[in-house]
Regions:
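Hydrophobic residues in alpha-helical segments
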Residues: 53-54, 78, 133, 166
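A general structural signal for short secondary-structure boundary/capping elements
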Residues: 51-57, 72-73, 132, 159
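Mixed-charge interfacial surface used for oligomerization/domain docking
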Residues: 3-5, 11-21, 25, 30, ...
Length: 243
């Protein structure tokens, strides 16, 4: 039976410790900060991205992983005797999956998987793939299983401000201003089709919003697997995280 390597896009947003524990190789997206081109999670941190946005008033620009980068990764592992399962960010949010599929053409033992998700939603699939590989499941079967699992993911997040959505062209300036004046914190829900939409709207300071949001996600949900709950945060004050 062939050895199996699990790889993923950096948009899975797992910690370095988790990538190491599950032996997952991460391919970074390119991030452009003005004239500086960086690689997500390699030579630029999340904190630097927020600092850049605050100081310049503009958002960093991201670029999908190139076909060539995918080819280099896939070929390196297949030539070493591995089958590869790669977990991509939703095809509705990036060209990464399309590029990975192009790179995998002609490689019968490479299986790109469209997670139909982002961030730790995709990360959940990458970890599950690593667990199945460790149990001896074939790469093709792992990919098929992930295609089933992705439909059961329950992923959402709440925003402190609409400022960055406005700068990214995803909402109007009037909507952003109104939400900020009313202290509205929208919940963004990822559908099992790989798109995002607005869910509940919360009002008040961020500490109250986060606690209300978490309660709202868990109450009445009897399909939660405790060992699979992930709380992902960014640019969040530590005192709120600790609660």
């Amino acid at each position: 039976m062939a050895k199996i390597k699990i790889t993923c896009d950096s948009t899975c947003d797992l910690t370095p410790e988790l990538y190491k524990r599950f032996d997952i190789e991460v391919l970074p997206l390119e991030v452009t900060l003005g004239n500086r081109v960086c690689h997500d999670g390699v030579d630029v941190t999340t904190e630097e991205l927020y600092d850049y946005a605050r100081k310049t008033g503009t958002l960093p620009k991201t670029s999908a992983i190139s076909v060539g980068s995918y080819e280099d990764c896939f070929r390196r592992w297949t030539e070493a005797g591995y089958d590869v399962v790669h977990v991509n960010i939703s095809n509705k949010l990036s060209a990464c999956y399309q590029n990975a599929c192009i790179a995998a053409e002609g490689m019968d033992n490479v299986f790109p998987v469209d997670s139909l998700n982002l961030s730790s939603g995709s990360g959940q699939l990458a970890m599950a793939a690593a667990e199945m590989a460790a149990e001896g499941m074939a790469a093709k079967d792992i990919a098929e299983k992930l295609n089933e699992m992705r439909l059961r993911l329950d992923v959402s997040f709440v925003l402190q401000t609409l400022e960055y959505l406005h700068k990214g062209g995803r909402c109007s300036g009037v909507a952003a201003l109104g939400a900020n004046l009313l202290k509205l914190r929208p919940e963004i829900v990822v559908s099992n089709e790989g798109t995002m939409s607005v869910g509940r709207k919360y009002r008040g300071n961020m500490e109250k919003t986060v606690l209300d949001y978490i309660r709202g996600r868990l109450e009445g949900n009897d399909n939660v697997v405790p060992g699979r709950i992930m709380i992902t945060h960014t640019d969040m004050p530590q005192e709120i995280v600790d609660k």
